[in-house]
Amino acid sequence: KKSRNHYNEMAVSLTNEDQVQLTLRFRVFDDGIGFRYEYTVPTVDSLLITDELTTFRFHRDGTSWSIPASAETYELLYQQQPISEVETANTPFTFKTADGVYGSIHEAALYDFPEMTLKQIGHYTLKAELAPWPDGIKARKGNHFTTSWRTIQIAPEAVGLINSSLILNLNDPCVLETTDWIRPLKYVGVWWGMHLGVETWKMDERHGATTANAKKYIDFAAANHIEAVLFEGWNEGWESWGGMQSFDFTKPYADFDIDEIVRYAKEKGVEIMGHHETGGNIPNYERQMDHAMQWYTDHGIHLLKTGYAGAFPDGYLHHSQYGVNHYQRVVETAA
């Protein structure tokens, strides 16, 4: 699929008496707009960003669909409510105006910057809020930096928001030379039994990720044309759950024969999707990440799902600059 990337651009450059340079860059597409801030402060080496003053003001009330703002999770219930009654929201913040136009506020090119959420400040106005570091600072940057794009998409019907390429077009170009190995797929796996309490993540008499159970799921996937199977609780360390999780990402439990499982899956035409649950312990995972991904490759596993079911240490937030940079490192290492 090819996307049309046609837009009009305007850059407004400002310089104050201290030679601080700010460029406001706008790109207007047929179905929306993106804008960002580009700063250069020549008299310093680094900058601490304490707030962002961007606001989105609606002319009058309308209907909205969103989840409450959270710097830790997206696993919240969506709410339909008047724009005027929204207290906080994660993006994308989807809305319908009184004139029947659909729209969405979101962001693009989120690199080395905290996620943006929205906060109601009155008069149908939503202010940008950035997920902070533990000390309250929103972002740490050098003396020249560019923010993420802030985006507003519009469409006559809601489906137009899904079909829009605006955010894709505002993201940086792909740096990979080949992308034919990237593909969507369906997968099933061992995890829901743990939530129901009939299986466990750690190795005991109810352990879910066993060789025998793995083969049952592989058989089911093959019979139902499902491309891959994932197993939670396959590796040592689940005994530490609830504290400072210390998983080992290259040591399967004794009842999980990874070589036999991969062999059996290949025989059935099914792939194994690896699982790295960090429990939020990012330092522990990053120490092992390169070796753990290579270990999967050496065992014939080329798919990976990471997990972050737990708070980050020392007050770091999932959607902060710290979290965004970690996820970027994971993607780049996997690629």
Regions found by a protein language model. Give the residues of each.
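N-terminal accessory beta-strand-rich subdomains and adjacent acidic, glycine-rich linkers
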Residues: 1-177
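Generic recognition of flexible, low-complexity loop/linker segments
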Residues: 23, 137-140, 216-218, 260, ...
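Conserved, mostly hydrophobic/aromatic
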Residues: 37, 221, 307
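Solvent-exposed loop/turn segments at secondary-structure junctions
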Residues: 37, 43, 157-159, 193-196, ...
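Short amphipathic alpha-helical segments and helix-helix/interface helices
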Residues: 53, 83, 92-94, 218, ...
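Intrinsically disordered, low-complexity acidic regions
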Residues: 133, 176, 215, 227-237, ...
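An acidic-aromatic substrate-binding cleft motif
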Residues: 142-224, 228
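Aromatic- and carboxylate-enriched substrate-binding clefts and catalytic-loop regions
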Residues: 232-335
